[in-house]
A protein has these predicted regions:
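Helix-loop-helix
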Residues: 1-64, 106, 196-202, 210, ...
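Soluble non-transmembrane domains of integral membrane proteins
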Residues: 70-71, 78, 85-347
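Non-transmembrane, membrane-proximal soluble domains of secreted or membrane proteins
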Residues: 53, 57, 61-93, 100, ...
Length: 633
């Protein structure tokens, strides 16, 4: 190290030391910072302590007052909770509200629905299908009293009251003589929709005068109901609809949270085939939605909503809400909007994931009507899918035929293309070779792109069906051949041991329909590559990539619904049969003669061909100039 460098480092050190010395905090600043940190710590501790007090308040009240005389206990409760004191202590009991399709249990503690079972459905292991029970749900309103006390309805004991309607249950929270808060639940026969009404009577001096809304906390765990946990979890999400606007949802693949300042029409906790939806006629305000992914166990996700609903303190108007406890069946969900104006429609059918844009349109106006129509006459859904596949293939036949004719033209012209390849060998003559090949196709009336367009036009239907089959609740628990349930995978071999990489992506089983789909796709790929070989040089690795695609489908679809893989298997088989029929019914000699006749006709170039040739000439000129420049060097 030379002298100048050493002096430089010493000066840098002196500057840094001086900067630190002159900018160090004063004792007063250090003391202020310490007091600030202590105050923050005290606030955080107080918040944690208050939260713990709120969580244990009910239990502490019951434990501390259990052995006291009634008069003393009433006095203590009155001091702590005012007019809600008596409702803080009680014995939990349940009232059942049910019809032929839904069974609900309403707890007197909190006056809430704490249990919901769908009678017409079972889980994958044939147990009753329960959407949630008391431990897996919470539904609480926060009440602010006239004396600024904060009380949670989940801590209060309501009293069941018999009404005039046998299909209704009234849970009443008494707050004094002539004043009470009523939660009314009404369930009509054969209906999945529960009307939920909140009405206060004589609460002017009970609740805070500024009360015009009630803060709501709604929590629910989403149980695993289907056989494939990973596959089901892809469809579990928290959906919500804006007032007179579209439906959106939180992330399906990870934990998510969102604050929504706009009013919401409804909030839905959606499983793969079933949903719990809370609907408000007036709308939910200042909503925060949370979705927590649970990687293991019987619970897939935990949903949480904090929001507020309008409330009339004068008791003149009720707060009208509704619950939907039921299946994600498109026709059923759509029926709730029958005869309703566009502004008031619920759009609950958007809980069914049918794709977006044109794919949803194809499902809504073609696939589902066709599926429902066939379902009126055919009760074996394996046969129904077979007939549906045949109908789709018949509809797509003109496009399929046009695509095959295009490949046949390319095939009969292959010898002439090979002659062009021999005439212009090497990379330096690639432009001449391409130009001559395009001229051949143009004169003969063939186009490499004419076979792509028909395939492209088929994609909306193919993608729509990909979205439809896993979402069709009609396939749930429907067996066909070896598949016990067409809504989940059909394992012919399975194992319990966790295998890294394989288990997370492939699963611990082998689906037979998926395997058959893969085999038929490999066969079709091999046959199609041989039939569509035009003699042109292919990109390196293209052949290997074509064979890799079916193997990737095996990994991707192994955990998908067997109804979907069965459809793809049948569809590929029909495509192979169609190709063989085309192959042996089309006279390629006559086709070649027709193309040769086209070559002798005056050639009329399309605008596209003219632009293509101009681009080729420009490329060729650029390449020629580059080669000349290299020679001069």
């Amino acid at each position: 190290m030379d002298k100048n460098t050493l002096i430089g480092f010493l000066l840098i050190g002196v500057v840094l030391f001086a900067f630190s010395w002159f900018n160090r905090p004063t004792p007063e600043q250090l003391e202020a910072q310490r007091r600030y940190q202590d105050s923050i710590a005290k606030i955080e501790y107080a918040q944690q302590l208050e939260l713990q007090k709120q969580e244990n308040k009910s239990a502490l009240v019951e434990d501390s007052l259990e052995n006291l005389p009634d008069s003393v206990r009433a006095q203590r409760l009155q001091q702590s909770f005012g007019v809600f004191g008596e409702a803080m202590v009680g014995t939990e009991d349940y009232t059942t509200l049910q019809n032929d399709v839904v069974e609900l249990r309403i707890s007197n503690k909190g006056g809430r629905i704490c249990y919901a079972r769908l009678k017409e459905y079972d889980t994958y292991n044939d147990e009753p299908l329960v959407l949630f029970d008391e431990k897996e749900s919470n539904f609480n309103f926060t009440l602010v009293t006239a004396t600024n006390r904060v009380v949670n309805t989940s801590d209060l004991y309501f009293t069941p009251v018999k009404g005039n309607d046998p299909n209704s249950v009234i849970m009443r929270l008494n707050t004094g003589e002539g004043s009470h808060l009523d939660f009314t639940y009404t369930l009509k026969p054969d209906d999945y929709m529960v009307q939920y009404q909140i009405l206060g009577t004589g609460l002017n001096g009970v609740l805070a005068p500024s009360t015009n809304a009630l803060d709501l906390l709604w929590e629910q765990d989403i149980r695993q109901q289907e056989k494939g946990r990973k596959f089901e979890d892809r469809y579990v999400t928290l959906n919500y609809k804006f007032m007179a606007d579209d439906v959106e949802h939180l992330s399906e693949s990870k934990s998510d949270s969102k604050q929504i300042p706009n009013r919401l029409k409804w909030i839905g906790y959606k499983d793969m085939f079933f949903s719990t939806v809370l609907i408000s006629q007036e709308g939910f305000e200042a909503t925060t939605l949370d979705s927590k992914a649970i990687p293991e166990g019987d619970v897939l996700k935990q949903f949480k909503t904090t929001t507020s609903v309008p409330f009339d303190l004068q008791g003149k108007e009720a707060t009208n809400l509704s619950f939907y406890f039921g299946p994600n069946k498109f026709a059923l969900l759509k029926s709730f909007d029958k005869g309703v104006s566009a502004e008031q429609q619920l759009d609950l059918e958007k809980l069914v994931p049918l794709g977006w844009g044109i794919f949803r349109w194809v499902n809504q106006y073609f696939v589902i009507p066709l599926f429902d129509f066939l379902g009126k006459f055919i009760h074996n859904y394996g046969i129904l899918i077979l007939l549906m596949t045949i109908i789709v293939k018949i509809i797509l036949f003109p496009l399929t035929y046009k695509s095959y004719m295009s490949s046949a033209k390319m095939r009969v012209l292959r010898p002439q293309v090979e002659e062009i390849n021999a005439k212009y060998p090497g990379q330096d003559k690639a432009m001449e070779r391409q130009k001559a090949t395009m001229e051949l196709y143009s004169r003969a009336g063939a186009s490499p792109m004419s076979g792509c367009l028909p395939m492209l036009l088929q994609m909306p239907i193919l993608i729509a069906l990909f979205m439809f089959f896993p979402s069709a609740i009609e396939l749930r628990h429907q067996s066909f051949l070896w598949a016990h349930d067409l809504s989940t995978y059909d394992a012919i071999f399975s194992w319990n041991k966790y295998i890294p990489i394989i288990t997370p992506y492939f699963g611990n089983h082998i689906s037979l329909f998926c395997l058959l789909m893969t085999i038929t796709n490999i066969f079709y790929t091999k046959y199609n590559m041989e039939m569509t070989n035009t003699g042109q040089q292919q990109m390196p690795g293209m052949k290997a990539m074509m064979y890799m695609m079916p193997l990737m489908f095996l990994v991707f679809f192994n955990q998908y619904a067997s109804g979907l893989t069965y459809y793809y298997f049948i569809s590929t088989l029909i495509t192979i049969v169609q190709t063989l029929i085309f192959r042996y019914t089309i006279n390629e000699d006559k086709l070649l003669a027709k193309l040769e006749a086209n070559k002798r006709k005056p050639m009329k170039k399309s605008g596209f061909m003219k632009r293509l040739e101009e681009a080729q000439r420009a490329q060729q000129e650029t390449l020629r100039k580059q080669q000349e420049a290299k020679k001069k060097r």
